Amino acid sequence: MQERKITISNRLGLHARAAAQLVRRASQFTSSVHLIREDTGDEADGKSILSVLLLAAPCGTCLIIKTDGEDDARAISALAELVEHKFGEEISDGVF
């Protein structure tokens, strides 16, 4: 089992497109993926778009990613990288 704390830092937060990217990436791994919103304790299945969207995580929200399974280390690294790179939405000057 792996666990990592991340902060949503893209301007629009975890909106539909970003959530879809996260779910697609999570679905590439056999490990289970759960996202927990640190401030509310709300938990989402990282492989369910509806579940992820229901977190309603704006910019600045701290999430805990938990993965469990044979490829959990690779899964958590891939998901953290996606979030850290702001889902590929923003270029260096902060404009889409």
Model-identified regions with their sequence ranges:
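N-terminal loops that bind phosphate or other acidic moieties
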Residues: 3-4, 8, 95-96
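Compact, glycine-rich, soluble single-domain proteins
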Residues: 7-59
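C-terminal structural segments of small proteins and small subunits
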Residues: 58-96
